[in-house]
């Protein structure tokens, strides 16, 4: 039975019959963005913990540094596997059910990591990493959920505000390790395990925020507004791919996001190795990575405003140009740590522009259930692109060095930018610009 808080507010059918309805929808849009942003802050603690603390725990439980990246890899795999499933669940049952399910699985993953540290069990740690990766898929879907009730005038801004709140998790999550000693004394848990207790609590708090705050469900309201409420159905992967082929602007946007994400992960993951090889200390490496993360997320609202004003396609291409410029700066930096830091900052800003603008194009280009399916496909592909970029980066670094890695990365970004421009211009001959 549907509870009163779940009922979807009716959207005016003939224009002008319900003068207050547009204002009601706008208030609901703003509230939805705030709820998603709050959940992103709480759930983001887990993502920040996986990258830093997960690698330390992996070394401790496996007994070798060779498995240091295993938890991050497992988390990335979990995000990729979950993205399509959560998108299908959103189409069938709404955003609230999809996001809540993902957060519950991620919280279970954090508990599994704690159990792995207590037992100890390295295989259980990897299982926990996969489940925590579902939280990454929730973060990705949340940015699209923020656009369910948006218009073309606010779509990029709404999306970017949710992306921006990821900054909190990226910064605070790794630093929870400083509370570990105190938590060990209070709980008796093994070293590093308490960080994932905090992560589990954050994920559960995010689940409560989503359950309480996303009422009515924004996807239900959007379906009522757009006249697609009765079209909820499972969209197979082949149908999503066929839909993407019929919408070249979205296809180009997805390609741009994949290229920017793969290059970002490849260059970022190998930069600490390069810097330490040129004498940089751990503190300097940490500062450089922190500035890069700040550039990725902190400027997202500004990027969203520019995309709404100038058009997301222009901002997407500008982001690709910044990625190329960043690779060029890093490639010629050598042992100049200042240049490397500048390059990583440009890389983060380029990633932000490409991701925010590309996501806005995907969110506004395809109607009905196919839109959510393509969003899930995009999220899964981004996770796989990041995993592929990180995996190949080490091989390329060993073969041609840091400068060569950046040259290859720049070439990938240039090729992707050209394809984005070509397919988008072809689309504009048939369809109006996004």
Regions found by a protein language model. Name each.
Residues 177-182, 200-225, 419-424:
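C-terminal membrane-cytosol helix-exit motif in multi-pass small-molecule transporters
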Residues 299, 310-358:
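C-terminal transmembrane helical hairpin of 12-TM major facilitator-type secondary transporters
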Residues 54, 137-151, 353-367:
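Intracellular juxtamembrane helix-capping segments at the cytosolic ends
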Residues 41, 122-137, 339-353:
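Hydrophobic core of transmembrane alpha-helices in multi-pass small-molecule transporters
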Residues 128-165:
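Cytoplasmic helix-loop-helix junction between adjacent transmembrane helices
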Residues 9-30, 215-255:
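Juxtamembrane intracellular "pre-TM" segments in multi-pass secondary transporters
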Residues 82-95, 181, 298-312, 397:
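Helix-to-loop junctions at the C-terminal end of transmembrane segments
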Residues 104-119, 322-335:
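C-terminal ends and interior cores of transmembrane alpha-helices
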């Amino acid at each position: 039975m549907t509870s009163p808080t779940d009922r979807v507010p009716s959207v005016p059918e003939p224009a002008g019959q319900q003068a207050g309805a547009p204002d009601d929808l706008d208030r609901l849009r703003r509230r939805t963005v705030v709820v998603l942003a709050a959940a992103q802050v709480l759930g983001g603690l887990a993502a920040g913990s996986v990258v830093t603390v997960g690698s330390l725990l992996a070394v401790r439980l496996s007994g070798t540094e060779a498995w240091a990246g295993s938890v991050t890899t497992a988390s990335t795999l979990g995000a990729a596997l979950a993205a399509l499933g959560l998108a299908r669940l959103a189409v069938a049952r709404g955003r609230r059910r999809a996001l809540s399910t993902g957060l519950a699985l991620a919280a279970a993953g954090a508990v599994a990591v704690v159990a792995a540290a207590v037992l100890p069990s390295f295989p259980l740690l990897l299982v926990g990493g996969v489940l925590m990766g579902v939280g990454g898929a929730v973060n990705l879907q949340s940015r699209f959920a923020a656009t369910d009730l948006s218009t073309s005038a606010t779509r990029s801004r709404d999306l970017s505000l949710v992306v921006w709140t990821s900054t909190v998790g990226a910064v605070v999550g790794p630093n929870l390790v400083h509370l570990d000693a105190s938590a060990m004394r209070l709980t008796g848990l093994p070293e590093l395990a308490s960080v994932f207790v905090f992560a589990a609590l954050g994920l559960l708090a995010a689940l409560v925020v989503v359950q309480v705050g996303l009422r009515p469900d924004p996807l239900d309201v959007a379906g009522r507004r757009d006249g697609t409420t009765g079209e909820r159905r499972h969209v197979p992967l082949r149908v999503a791919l066929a839909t993407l082929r019929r919408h070249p602007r979205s296809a180009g946007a997805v390609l741009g996001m994949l290229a920017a994400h793969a290059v970002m992960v490849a260059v970022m993951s190998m930069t600490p190795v390069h810097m330490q090889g040129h004498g940089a200390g751990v503190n300097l490496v940490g500062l450089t990575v922190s500035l890069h993360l700040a550039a990725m997320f902190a400027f997202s609202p500004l990027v969203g405003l520019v995309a709404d004003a100038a058009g997301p396609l222009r901002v997407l291409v500008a982001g690709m140009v910044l990625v190329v410029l960043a690779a060029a700066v890093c490639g010629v930096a050598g042992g100049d740590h200042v240049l490397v830091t500048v390059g990583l900052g440009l890389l983060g800003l380029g990633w932000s522009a490409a991701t925010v603008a590309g996501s806005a194009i995907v969110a506004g280009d395809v109607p009905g259930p196919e839109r959510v399916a393509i969003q899930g496909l995009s999220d899964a592909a981004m996770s796989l692109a990041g995993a592929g970029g990180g995996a190949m980066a080490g091989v390329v670094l060993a073969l041609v060095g840091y400068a060569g890695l950046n040259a290859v990365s720049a070439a990938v970004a240039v090729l992707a930018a050209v394809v984005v421009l070509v397919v988008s211009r072809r689309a504009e001959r048939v369809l109006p610009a996004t």
